[in-house]
Amino acid sequence: YKQCHKKGGHCFPKEKICIPPSSDLGKMDCRWKWKCCKKGSG
């Protein structure tokens, strides 16, 4: 269990999720995902 802290409604740490492109011409689709905190809890 990692300790998480809130900042401006977002939670840290966050991890980068990368999805391979659907075509060879595309770039890797990378986006940040908030890893720890869940909305609506506590």
Curated annotation (Swiss-Prot):
Protein name per Swiss-Prot or TrEMBL: Myotoxin-A
From which organism does this entry originate? Crotalus viridis viridis
One MF term in the entry's GO annotations: potassium channel regulator activity
Coiled-coil annotated spans = none
Q: Which family does it belong to?
A: Belongs to the crotamine-myotoxin family.
GO BP field? envenomation resulting in occlusion of the pore of voltage-gated potassium channel in another organism
A single GO cellular-component term from the record reads: extracellular region
Q: Where are the disulfide bridges?
A: 4-36, 11-30, 18-37
> Which compartments is it annotated to reside in?
Secreted
What is said about its interaction partners and assembly? Monomer.
Where, by tissue, is this protein expressed?
A: Expressed by the venom gland.
Query: Which Pfam families does this UniProt record tie to the protein?
Result: Myotoxins
